[in-house]
UniProtKB/Swiss-Prot annotation:
Family annotation (Pfam families): GATase_7, Pribosyltran
Domain of life from the UniProt record: Bacteria
Limits of the Glutamine amidotransferase type-2 domain: 11-231
Catalytic activity from the UniProt record: 5-phospho-beta-D-ribosylamine + L-glutamate + diphosphate = 5-phospho-alpha-D-ribose 1-diphosphate + L-glutamine + H2O
Residues the record lists as binding Mg(2+): 294, 356-357
Name of the protein in question: Amidophosphoribosyltransferase
Source species: Staphylococcus epidermidis (strain ATCC 35984 / DSM 28319 / BCRC 17069 / CCUG 31568 / BM 3577 / RP62A)
Amino acid sequence: MSNYSGLNEECGVFGIWNHPEAAQLTYMGLHSLQHRGQEGAGIVVSNHETLKGERGLGLLTEAIKDEHMSNIKGYPHAIGHVRYATSGNKGIENIQPFLYHFYDMSVGICHNGNLINAKSLRQNLEEQGAIFHSSSDTEVIMHLIRRSKAPTFEEALKESLRLIKGGFTFAILTKDALYGVVDPNAIRPLVVGKMENGAYILASETCAIDVLGAEFIQDIHAGEYVVITDEGIEVKTYTRQTTTAISAMEYIYFARPDSTIAGKNVHAVRKASGKRLAQENPAKADMVIGVPNSSLSAASGYAEEIGLPYEMGLVKNQYVARTFIQPTQELREQGVRVKLSAVKDIVDGKDIVLVDDSIVRGTTIKRIVKMLKDSGANRIHVRIASPEFMFPSFYGIDVSTTAELISASKSPEEIKNHIGADSLAYLSVDGLIESIGLDYDAPYHGLCVESFTGDYPAGLYDYEKNYKKHLSERQKSYIANNKHYFDSEGNLHV
């Protein structure tokens, strides 16, 4: 899947403790996480006495300009956020980190992922008199914390975390500490690094640690939270009801290829998936082409395994923001023409294996196939380095309805005809799991593959009724004929 198909990541979070240039380093860290969200960005800083922040709409360079940075320089602690809206509207009021000033403390908080029981929690809180200032589900946890009777902020945080469901990470800043939180399934990643001067870093991906020249310390695991203070770092647990289920889509599409998740480099995983795809679904052709940018690693693996030349038959305009961030399908489709072009002299008269990482709605791959054929390509064999994207995701990906998914209603043969390809094949679920190579004692070896299997490790909660109401016949058939490990509340079947 290209960067233009309408599949969107939720957000990226970053935090740093005890560095004299915390705001500047946070800005750099967020820049390396820009691929995770382009609708807005923000930074909150602290100096043990005061918390203050800046935020704005658009790319990081548009949201936080030099004059904003001058307002937050000189503070030693910071958190930052880049946003793509998976819940809530796209106004400035939803740009994070949120900054709260209470009579007894100030708190900055930002969030990556989606809370699948936020609607019901919000309703209960409003019935108790809570007033919300945004439509983002992140605000829910702050209300839960403030309504807790626990004696300390940390205890109130732990109590509140046990009430929320979904795939999430949080970065939270107070005057005394920096907190990092991971959901009970570790669906969304969070890592810790350390700089030469002793400053600690939290980030959604290791690439944000690497860009600052910091040392990777560890992943934060399922149901864990980290507390960073002037005394050092401590990793604790807020729940022992955990089952590791790391999002497969982080490896397939969302994360940067130079990032490492749970010990597995993203580029290496994608290349391995391309090799496995070639083993499972070879094709006779003159060359292999990948859809820029997230499919290039898989395409190189496919070409290497099958012994075909790997060519640059598609070129991406690197100076246009990623189209998938556009809020309407029409804008996304127009963006494909602006951002991708075929190299006619390479593809003219050739049989091509076109490798993409996924098909979600099918509109983008259809346009790319047409673009290549208009440029003279002969036969086009589409190979997808992931299984059929048949089920919606509720854990922070902007595909939360069955109607958006072409594989929910169409077979591979029907999709092949729809997109104008000469053949179409997908990587198997087992092939994906083995290519990634995790080895947790958990279903799917510790992967969350809900979009391919309809098996939801964190449950469905507020989404259950609508999800079940709109299940297609293909989805029902898949569920009936394949083993599922989790019930609608994310509990393992006994």
